[in-house]
Amino acid sequence: MKHIVKNILTNKERKKLIKDCEPYLLSGKELSKKYGIDITFPAKQTQEQIYNIPCFTDPINKILLASANTLRQSLVLKRVWINCTSGKKEDVLWHNHIPMEWSCVYYMKTLPFVDSGTLFKDGFMRAPQNSLIIFPANLDHCPPTSPFRFKRYSMALDLVRTS
């Protein structure tokens, strides 16, 4: 089951998050080099341990709280990173987050009616800017393409239930 939670951060917090992430965004080639693997990641992304960076702590905690309250489960954060896509086809890579239990996408900055949401195999799930989609991690998904070269910022989180 997929869930949408709206109004996660204040507008000031959301804009600060966008500004704060800029120096941490890496190209796919830079990210591959950092991880020491021969895969080119799509678009620009941060590394997946940004929870260790103080400027991201509060927004991540708000998203975790919203996720735990929505799912009515105690959750542990396993990975979190930020994506910056521009609607290009090369930014699209169908994927899932197995073996995680839950995945979330928080929409930091989107273009309404164009790229505000996530494409799943069963269709596009629309979600407004400053909202969160929570879904089972085994679902294949990708960011939508767009004819506009507008920067779309999203934060991805992988979660598991506490034992």
Where are these regions (language model features)?
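Non-heme Fe(II)/2-oxoglutarate
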Residues: 1-73, 91
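Catalytic core of non-heme Fe(II) oxygenases with the double-stranded beta-helix
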Residues: 73-145, 150-163
